[in-house]
C-alpha cells in the first residue's frame, strides 16, 4: 500500500508541530512495511535527501508566501501523489484539507489529521479564517478517515 503525505513543510529537522508529528509518525509506519512518500516544500528544505528512515522524500517548488503557500503546495502534492500511484493521501492540517475533494475525485482514499483550529490564531485575517474553517469542514466531511489530534 502506497501512502503519500501532504500538508507538511517537510522532514527532517524542519520546525513546526505538524513537521515534528510527521517526523515521528511516518518512519514508524514505513518500518511496518508500508510504502510511505512525504512531499516537502522545497523552500524549507536544506538538504538533498531522497529518503529519511525508510520514508521517501519528494521536493516540490512552492512560493514562500504565507497566504498561498500551503494551498499551492497541496494542489501540486496531490497531483504528484496521483502520478506516483498513491493508494492513500494523508493530509495534515486544515488549510491543506481544503483540497480533500480533489484527492477523492482523483480516486485516492484520504486520511486527514486535524492538528488544531488554526483559524483561532491572530496571524490570520477574516478571509483566511473563513477559508481555514472551510478547509476544516472539507477535511472532516469528505475524507475516508479522520484523525483528530488534541
Write out the residue ranges for each language-model feature.
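N-terminal strand-loop element at the rim of the active site
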Residues: 6-14, 21-22, 28-65
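Conserved donor sugar-nucleotide recognition element shared by glycan-biosynthetic enzymes
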Residues: 18, 70, 132
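An aromatic- and histidine-rich active-site surface loop
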Residues: 71-78, 82, 86-119
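A short, charged, and often flexible helix/loop element on the N-terminal side
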Residues: 52-79, 121-128
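Membrane-proximal helix-turn-helix segments that form the acceptor-binding/catalytic region
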Residues: 79-82, 105, 129-145
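Extreme N-terminal starter segment of soluble prokaryotic enzymes
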Residues: 1-3
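Conserved small/polar residues in nucleotide/adenosyl-binding loops
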Residues: 146-150
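Short glycine-/acidic-enriched loop or helix-start segments at secondary-structure transitions
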Residues: 15-16, 47-48, 69, 99-101, ...
Amino acid at each position: 500500500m502506497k501512502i503519500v503525505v501532504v500538508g507538511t513543510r517537510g522532514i527532517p529537522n524542519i520546525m513546526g508541530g505538524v513537521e515534528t508529528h510527521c517526523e515521528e509518525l511516518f518512519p514508524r509506519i514505513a518500518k511496518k512495511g508500508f510504502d510511505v512518500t512525504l512531499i516537502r516544500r522545497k523552500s524549507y528544505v536544506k538538504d538533498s535527501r531522497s529518503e529519511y528512515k525508510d520514508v521517501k522524500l519528494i521536493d516540490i517548488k512552492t512560493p514562500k508566501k504565507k497566504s498561498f503557500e500551503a494551498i499551492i503546495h497541496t494542489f501540486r502534492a496531490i497531483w504528484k501523489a496521483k502520478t506516483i500511484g498513491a493508494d492513500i493521501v494523508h493530509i495534515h492540517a486544515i488549510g491543506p484539507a481544503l483540497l480533500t475533494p480533489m484527492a477523492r475525485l482523483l480516486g485516492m482514499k484520504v486520511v486527514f489529521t486535524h492538528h488544531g483550529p488554526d483559524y483561532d490564531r491572530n496571524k490570520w485575517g477574516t478571509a483566511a479564517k473563513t477559508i481555514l474553517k472551510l478547509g476544516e469542514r472539507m477535511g472532516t466531511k469528505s475524507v475516508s478517515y479522520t484523525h483528530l489530534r488534541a
